[in-house]
């Protein structure tokens, strides 16, 4: 018997042996859609959330941390009644490594179909979801769970107006031209008590921007700022757009949000709510995302606003994009010492999660398994700061799996590096920004945002003419550092401007 024949007999024997390895068990979710919910065959992202206990697991979509309910994601193209969307063991998953690692037990399962192209939110109008379903799952035994999308997020409806809060939604011509479809700006407006009692009086305008993804409905809460004897109109911008928070500036991917806000929204609000319409009577403020936006609006539109109060701003110098130096680092996930790069810390320095952990979640949420289409933080930054790819989508700064940084996109990012913008244009900007910039950050910021502010502050020491502004650090203070009453300071600056 020759060796080749012996080998064949041995292989056949192993294949038929009772001790041969069993094929891996299949873990699979099959999702159908009820008739009448989609306008036609529709592309989107199908998400499966595996919760514990009662309630709706979909409410947990977007949470980070190792204890968050697992969520899986897969694309479904041309989804329609009669088409089965499949999410299985090969799909992207968070926070565990794979579906085979899921602990056996009872789960409350819910499916979501995210397809709204204008608002990258799981609960955006038109998105579909299933009713929760309790199922026993054991990955070692395998399973197939069938779900049906029967529920739909209702059409957008503005909250009810009140005596001191009004809400707006109107079509932006600039954004509609860019996107080739109707695009809308939404805003909340908090009015001072004097608006009703002094009908001939005009007011300064404060543009308020909240933390990441804060919606315009925050106007119901910011009205409390007006109780301190600072009569002004507060305009609350909306932190939702095609790639998450649009950051209210012009970008290659989101379109001309900055121009839409300054040339369409603000003039409309000033006419409607008796504002002065004078640059000396316009101000910006916000924290975190709002900290960056308030500063960016002041820098990119230096003659349009009379001051910004920026708290814990998102990275203002891309040498410290949190802990990533986009100009010299090779990898977003691993630092130059070979260790995983933290993405959030406690005040004592302990790591809460890493950049890789955050991006794993965004790869689940993003179409084509891509963090740069997730609608979350890294996605939004990439869309605002980076270039548009040949496919019409944002070009990613780094590879979704390896974290390797693509140096070819960095040139576009420089245009939104606020330290570089100020440095490169300081001769022109200095007189137009005199006394207008106020930045505050804790030097133990949860997201390492103090590092970029420190680099900016160091750069301003070399400015000629000298920098006329405030950059203040709070010792051992985290992301909530807020040492001044900005409304009082804004009121004081407005009074000194002598606007009549």
Predicted regions and their residues:
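Mature N-terminal segment immediately following signal peptide/propeptide cleavage
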Residues: 23-54, 167-170
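Bacterial N-terminal signal peptides
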Residues: 5-17
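Beta-rich accessory regions
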Residues: 22-23, 461
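N-terminal secretory signal peptides that target proteins for export/translocation
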Residues: 1-3
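Selective for proline/serine-rich intrinsically disordered segments
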Residues: 16, 21-22, 190, 202
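A short, compositionally biased domain-edge/stem linker segment
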Residues: 17-19, 32-35, 149-157
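Non-catalytic cap/lid and distal C-terminal segments of serine-dependent acyl enzymes
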Residues: 51-500
